[in-house]
Amino acid sequence: MSVKFYQPKSSILRKYVEGFYFMNTDGGQPFEYYTFPNNFCIVSVLRNADLVISQDEAVLSRSLFSKELCSLTYRYRTPLRVVYKEPVDEITIYFKPFGIHQFVKGMERFLTPESTASFDPFPEFRSHLSGIFDIGERTEQICRLEEVLLGFFEERKDLFLDEILSLLEDDVSVEEISRQLNVSRQYLGQYFKLKIGKTLSEYRLTERFRKSLQLMKSGSAHNFTELTYENLYFDQSHFSKDFKAITNLSPKEFFRRAQWLDHNVWLIV
């Protein structure tokens, strides 16, 4: 299975959107894969499809009825199994941390488990995005998707959260972040979870995992020893333990079996 991941052409969108991909019902067979924790906020728009989400599995199939639906995925701490009983029409958008807030006002109210299977922040959101399925050419679909997103765009700054995210990107400890920003660890954690939908420790662990993937993919780290110290782990056993907690696989087994989708990684079953 080949899925092309597109990055936005708009400089405004590139600041907040990592990218997007399309799937359709033309040809293809049932398939399934595992996707692994990340810090993106992922929105999928589906046409004429049914979606059932459980704690560690999402099952998609063609619907007997004509309909469109949107789903939201922003928090899973272990591999998520995604099963396509039949191919479906789908557009999936990867928003960067705090990115989706620039397109959906009051996004915090949707960062609850109940929002994942049915994400309808406002009437035009689903209808405008699902209208892209009626466009035949991929290049025109991409242009229209960017137009729709720019139509939703309204910048919402949060300098405090930006500072937290920047420090996490530099792998600064939670204790040190609270000291630098002169707030309690409790307030820091509560504020972060309200805005991002996951705990600081979850985010930090996932960020280390994603950096490991990028280092191996880019060739910057040539073995697991280099990968351990590039990610500021004390030793390889600590690195392997954290890695297995996220993937359910050892690093060696994971890199042997996984397949890259540009900015994400899947394990095809």
Feature annotation, model-predicted:
Residues 159-160, 164-166, 191-216, 242, ...:
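Alpha-helical DNA-contacting segments of helix-turn-helix folds
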